[in-house]
Each structure stands twice: as structure tokens, then as C-alpha cells.
Amino acid sequence: DRYKQSARKDIYQAFAKYLIEQGRAYPCFATPEELDEMRKKQEAAKIRPGYYGVWATYRNLSVEEAAKKIKAGEPYIVRFKSMGNEERKIRHHDVIKGNVEFPENDQDIVIIKADGLPTYHFAHAVDDHLMRVTHVIRADEWLSSVPLHLELFKALGFAVPKYAHTSAILKDDEGKKRKISKRKDPEAAVSYYHEEGIPAEAVKEYLLNIANSNFENWRRQNQAEDMEHFELQLNKMSVSGALFDMVKLLDVSKSVISRFDAEKVYSESLKWAEKYDEELAEMLKADKELSLIHISEPTRQA
């Protein structure tokens, strides 16, 4: 299974070995106590935290010294040896954000943990290269990791993918905008929309409205078309986060349901009712034909 990291341990270790041979990675024997002491000193001196520069005490350990420690059974991890300088800047084009500028990465981050498995950063580079990934779409909280990932890809000799960093969906919380939270907000869970009786198709269409402002106009002109035919364009996505709008979502939901045939409305309603409204489920099952008539030709008030 190419997606199961534990089954790909040998692959990651082979690439880590390559970096070590190239002088771009090294075994680090720093103990938790040493790292904690380092953090305290950095905090006291009010300088950037991390394992870099003079703080990277095992960075220049000789091959003989490292081999001796490994042979003695000392636990270790493997760190990437950065050649960056925090005082230098790099310029990068993000598909969504446009041109962005960062300090170079100078952190000797962990690439192989003590259990032999990779960190996210290393797995991202190795897996995406082997799976021929051309575009990486992820949350903008990862934007600051771009300098590290660019350096890592180049050190491995890999083609760098195009990055597209999406902004989070926001919520109005008593007049203040904040990111929708998995801990605080039920709207962050897919199950919430199912419980509310909102079809998955409606949620997808609403998200397309947020993703590309021209989707709404496309939908008006192509009412019978499957949304899959809409061409989502990353460079037209909003740079800032969109505000979650339940009224708009319900409006989209009504429009989506209106395109369902009566049989689909009935079957989807029954599935929902069997889980969330037993009384309604019994009514629907009692007379399917009558239910279909009501769905197809809703009673009109005079």
C-alpha cells in the first residue's frame, strides 16, 4: 500500500541514506534533556527557537564518531542539514497567493524519527515525488514551510511541485471573524450537514461558490449540468478566507434538491428519516405512491 508509511520504511530510509552520503543529512544523538536545555537557553536569550547554526551540536560530528555512537546502541534520529541563511530571502510563486517572500530555511529539521519512520516534511517530499504529484493544495498554515520544502526537494534532486495554499473558511463569532474550529463548531464536521438534511451535492456546490466566484454565474447558465463539468481554477481562488454563510448554503441546497427527480427525493428523504426522524420514516413508507405525488406536485395554497 503506497499510502501506508509503515510499509514504506525502507524507501524513506534509502532516501535519507542518500542525503547523508551527499552531506545533506546526519544522525543526531541529542537527548530530550539536551533539547530542553537548548530551548531554555534560547528563550532566556530571546532568540529564535530551533535546531540550527551553533545550536546544531551534532551537525558536524565525524562519520567515525557517529558510527561509534550507533554501534554503542545510542538512540538517534536523522536531521536534514540545511544550507540556508535566515538573513537571505527567497521569492516563490504560489498558485493562489501569488508572489510571496520568505527568509531561507536554516533549521536542521528531523526527517527520520527514532522509530525509523519519516516526519511529515520528509514523507511529503518522497511520497509526492514517487507519485508524480505536480500540484500540492493545502491549508495556508503550511505556507511558512515552503522554504524548507523547496530546499528539501532540491537536495533530493526532485522536481519541485507547484504549491497552492488555500485560506480557511471563517465564521462570524459575535462580530469577530475566526477560523471554523473542529473543536468549537459543528459546521466543521461533515456529519453536521447530513444530520441537517443537506445533500452532499449541495455542500459541494456551496464550496465551489466559495472556491471560485464565477461558479454561481456558470450554474445559472448551465442549470442541468453536473457540477463536475465546472472547471475549477486555482488562480481564481480567493486569497483571503471566505465567511461561512448558512443562509447561502440552504439556498444552494434548495436549488440542488429542485434538480432531483421525485424518486431520488423520496429515497434520500427516507434514508435520512430512518436515521433521524422515525415518525417521518413511517409516514413515507406507509404510502410511497402518495409520497411521490406530493413530492412531484406539491400542494399549492390558494
Where would I find each of the regions flagged by the language model?
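Residue patterns forming the tRNA-binding/recognition surfaces of aminoacyl-tRNA synthetases
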Residues: Q13, Q22-R24, N209
